[in-house]
């Protein structure tokens, strides 16, 4: 019956030979059916537990015979290949082109129509399964297949049901299965379910169905399982680069055939010999900060770069050559230079003196009478015009004098300007009003070309930034160097004006792509070097724009040029260095190591370490760590170290590397212990704290004239002894590797504050059931340090009055701290300007501004203070259930007091507020866990 056929009624029973199969029921007389077995129809020639004559059915088999099993889904493969009959069965049993229905299809049939096929030894000898199953394909005919049937049943049951073997199929002595061990040991049903997905290694029939598919994979590899292809089908050559400039190569071999690997070591310096990059690295005499280097070698290298890499036919090449010439000048003069020296260098590099076209003088509104002063000449017969008479210099001066005879100064001034008598005009106008002098001066400068350096000079002398500084770099303006030479050689009284003019010229050139020219101007203006990626910085590497990609920015030529400039500064000041440049030195050292020059790279590492060890321990921790990693790989390339290394001490290292490693470890420990420094470091108030109480975290306060102590230990519940001195020595917070920190330094870092809401974790209690009061907000105690002769009672009373007289200010300060505590702008928040009560602004109290920002002292610290007559109305809005040490005595808390909370709750608040900076909260309130 096909799955698409409609269900049919049970046919009439007729006698028919057993084993005729389903094909005869379809193409011939319907076979008789015997409703004796419920479940799936057994396959012809297969083993059936209901007809096994060798042994009785077990409990598991009885269970299987009464329940229809459903096959595993194979996602598109409906018929497992081992369910189809072999070719021999089709030939002997008239199967023709019809195939055996899968078990899942047989389950759809009526259980009353199931009839087992008769099975005999002769039928078994025919064996339709021959040629398919691996255990039956090679077996001779006529052999008893009972053991094979048992193995088939056992493997089929594991494949369909997914359970372990019960140990009865093979009939051979074996170890109990995993499922049986679980049942005997009394494990729960979860162990039974787990055993369904675990193959028992003690089952002997695991090889019965190696070619069959099963969702439960065995522990060992299957023959027909899909194997991952090899990454390399043929023997290959593994290659790696060593830190000492070595190339490690493993020759191809076959380890399975017993071939030993052959390792070859090649020098990268030899392999890369003749390449452009290596020749460029070897030509540079770096590192320059060494004793055996002479500055002549550096000057020679600069001149070689000018001749080889600078194209003087282009403006960019001339600008690059100018930078190299400036470095030569600095080396020759030991790092010192003046404006006139640079001006001479600028004019030497110019190809020729440009000729600037002069303009005709512009006459103002004052003019002369043409008919009175014009001298007419002979009429030209060709053109019909009367040409003017060309007057000599003497005649021009004579007419200027005649005008002054008649007192016509304005006319004389205009005559002098028309005839280029600028000396006479300027002197005459200087003795007149200032407006006339400015008019003559502007008329004189208007006769000069716009791009004339004289125009730049006169504009600078006039007290304004020259126009050339804002417009240079264009084709119509010509070369920018004469203008810079004028600015450098002629310093005006206002040095700020001269500096701004040079910087403006550099910015103009940089905006038009002339990076080398702009950096030349920046060097003349003493602009400091910045960092890559910071657009506000004007330069990071000399002659290279830091606004382009890093690979194009950090070139070898730019790093070498920058190192020469640093060397020139060291010639003048031996201890000077460029701190932002050290990271590029490390990059250059790594490139040297990559090109097979490890000894030279190690010298760079030593110089960088020397600079870092002179700095603050927290200046550049990342650079120090990367430098340590590279130096540890290159340390054995030092020839001096190899000569001094004894045979019994193979771990000898240079001293600078040991110091650098210690410095890196110190920085790492500081970073790891920063959130927990308050818990790990002993604090001065530990000896005065009450046992069973948590310590108060550090609290900065204002540095007033009398505020020498900003921490007060908890006071016992019975009150302080009136004869006891409660003054505390000045507090010094110990920080790892730094030493004691003053109170002024602590005040520079504001605290982070937060008030928990109702429902948060309560404070821990001691053995007496009293909760531990811990300060978690910034508060400034109004108590001051008193001498042994002063009484502590007066101080406590004053504190009580101060805290009780200003409850509104305290509550406002608390809410203000809560709103700004975990925000970044809270670090820069200015002090609120408020008017305080006279008691809060006395000489013995802290600063009023800071007192408004902080909460008062804890109520448990002043039990002897008298509360005010009326309770404060600001107690009710507080949304937290606070309990303090006063609960043990049954006393009510003092009115107007702001309750405190446990700092252990800060971690919970930070977790509930993901937008808050967790790092700051952990730093100020370490996690006690």
From Swiss-Prot:
Residues 228-669 are annotated as: Central conserved domain (CCD). It comes from the Eukaryota. Gene3D superfamilies: 1.25.40.1030. GO terms for cellular component: endoplasmic reticulum exit site; endoplasmic reticulum membrane; ER to Golgi transport vesicle membrane; Golgi membrane. It is a peripheral membrane protein. SEC16A and SEC16B are each present in multiple copies in a heteromeric complex. Plays a role in the organization of the endoplasmic reticulum exit sites (ERES), also known as transitional endoplasmic reticulum (tER). Required for secretory cargo traffic from the endoplasmic reticulum to the Golgi apparatus. Involved in peroxisome biogenesis. Regulates the transport of peroxisomal biogenesis factors PEX3 and PEX16 from the ER to peroxisomes. This is Protein transport protein Sec16B.
């Amino acid at each position: 019956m096909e799955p698409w056929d409609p269900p049919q009624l049970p046919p009439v029973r007729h006698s028919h030979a057993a084993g005729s199969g389903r094909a005869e029921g379809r193409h011939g007389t319907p076979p008789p059916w015997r409703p004796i077995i419920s479940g799936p129809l057994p396959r012809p020639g297969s083993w059936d537990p209901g007809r096994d004559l060798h042994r009785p059915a077990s409990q598991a088999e009885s269970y299987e015979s009464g329940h229809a099993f459903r096959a595993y889904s194979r996602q598109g493969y409906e018929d497992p290949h081992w369910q189809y009959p072999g070719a021999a069965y089709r030939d002997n049993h008239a199967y023709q082109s019809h195939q055996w229905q899968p078990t899942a299809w047989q389950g759809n049939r009526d259980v009353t129509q199931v009839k087992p096929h008769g099975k005999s030894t002769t039928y078994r000898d025919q064996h339709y399964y021959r040629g398919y199953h691996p255990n039956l394909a090679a077996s001779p005919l006529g052999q008893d297949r009972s053991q094979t049937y048992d193995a088939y049943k056992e493997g089929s049951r594991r494949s369909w049901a997914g359970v372990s073997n019960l140990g009865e199929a093979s009939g051979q002595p074996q170890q109990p299965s995993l499922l049986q061990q679980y049942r005997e040991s009394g494990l729960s049903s979860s162990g039974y379910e787990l055993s369904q997905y675990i193959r028992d290694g003690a089952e002997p029939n695991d090889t019965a169905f190696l070619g069959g598919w099963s969702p439960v994979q065995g522990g060992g590899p299957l023959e027909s399982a899909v194997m991952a292809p090899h990454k390399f089908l043929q023997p290959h050559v593994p290659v790696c680069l060593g830190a000492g400039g070595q190339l490690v190569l493993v020759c191809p071999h076959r380890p399975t055939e017993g071939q030993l690997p052959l390792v070859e070591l090649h020098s990268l310096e030899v392999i890369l010999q003749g390449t452009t990059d290596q020749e460029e690295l070897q030509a540079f005499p770096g590192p320059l900060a060494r004793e055996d280097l002479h500055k002549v070698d550096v000057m020679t290298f600069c001149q070689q770069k000018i001749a080889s890499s600078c194209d003087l036919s282009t403006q960019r090449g001339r600008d690059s050559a100018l930078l190299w010439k400036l470095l030569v000048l600095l080396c020759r003069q030991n790092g010192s230079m003046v404006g006139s020296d640079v001006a001479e260098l600028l004019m030497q590099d110019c190809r020729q003196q440009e000729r600037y076209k002069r303009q005709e003088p512009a006459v103002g509104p004052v003019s002369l009478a043409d008919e009175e002063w014009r001298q007419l000449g002979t009429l030209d017969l060709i053109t019909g015009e009367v040409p003017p008479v060309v007057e000599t210099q003497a005649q021009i001066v004579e007419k200027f004098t005649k005008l002054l005879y008649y007192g016509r100064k304005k006319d004389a001034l205009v005559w002098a300007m028309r005839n280029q008598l600028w000396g006479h005009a300027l002197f005459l106008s200087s003795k007149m009003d200032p407006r006339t002098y400015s008019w003559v001066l502007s008329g004189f400068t208007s006769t000069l070309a716009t791009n004339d350096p004289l125009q730049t000079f006169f504009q600078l002398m006039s007290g304004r930034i020259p126009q050339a500084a804002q417009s240079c770099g264009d084709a119509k303006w010509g070369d920018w160097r004469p203008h810079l030479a004028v600015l450098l050689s002629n310093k005006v009284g206002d040095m700020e004006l001269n500096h701004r003019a040079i910087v403006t010229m550099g910015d103009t050139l940089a905006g038009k792509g002339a990076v080398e020219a702009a950096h030349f101007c920046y060097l003349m203006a003493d602009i400091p070097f910045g960092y890559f990626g910071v657009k506000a910085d004007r330069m990071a590497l000399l002659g290279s724009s830091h606004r382009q990609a890093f690979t194009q920015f950090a070139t070898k030529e730019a790093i070498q040029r920058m190192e020469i400039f640093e060397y020139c500064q060291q010639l003048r000041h031996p201890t000077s260095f460029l701190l932002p440049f050290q990271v590029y030195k490390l990059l250059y050292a790594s490139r040297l190591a990559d090109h097979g020059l490890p000894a030279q790279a190690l010298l760079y590492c030593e110089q960088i370490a020397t600079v870092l060890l002179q700095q603050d321990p927290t200046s550049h921790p990342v650079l120090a760590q990367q430098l340590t990693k590279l130096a540890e790989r290159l340390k054995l390339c030092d020839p001096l170290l190899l000569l001094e290394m004894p045979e019994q001490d193979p771990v000898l290292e240079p001293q600078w590397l040991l110091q650098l490693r210690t410095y890196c470890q110190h920085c790492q420990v500081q970073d790891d212990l920063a959130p927990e420094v308050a818990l790990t470091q002993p604090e001065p108030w530990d000896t005065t704290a009450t046992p069973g109480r948590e310590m108060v975290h550090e609290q900065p306060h204002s540095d007033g004239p009398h505020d020498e102590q900003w921490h007060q230990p908890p006071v016992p519940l019975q009150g302080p002894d009136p004869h006891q001195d409660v003054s505390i020595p000045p507090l010094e917070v110990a920080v790892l590797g730094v030493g004691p920190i003053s109170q002024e330094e602590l005040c520079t870092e504001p605290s982070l504050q937060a008030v928990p809401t109702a429902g948060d974790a309560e404070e821990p209690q001691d053995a007496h059931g009293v909760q531990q009061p811990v300060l978690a907000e910034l508060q400034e105690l109004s108590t001051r340090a008193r001498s042994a002769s002063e009484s502590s009672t007066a101080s406590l009373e004053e504190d009580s009055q101060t805290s009780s007289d200003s409850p509104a200010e305290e509550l406002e300060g608390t809410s203000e701290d809560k709103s700004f505590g975990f925000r970044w702008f809270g670090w820069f928040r200015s002090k609120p300007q408020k008017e305080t009560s006279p008691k809060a602004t006395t000489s013995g109290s802290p600063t009023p501004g800071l007192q408004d920002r902080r909460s008062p002292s804890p109520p448990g610290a002043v039990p002897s203070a008298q509360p005010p007559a009326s309770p404060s109305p600001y107690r009710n809005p507080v949304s937290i259930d606070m309990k303090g040490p006063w609960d043990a005595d049954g006393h009510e808390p003092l009115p107007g007091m702001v309750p405190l909370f446990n700092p252990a709750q800060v971690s919970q608040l930070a977790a509930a507020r993901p937008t808050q900076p967790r790092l700051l909260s952990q730093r100020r309130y370490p996690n006690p866990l």
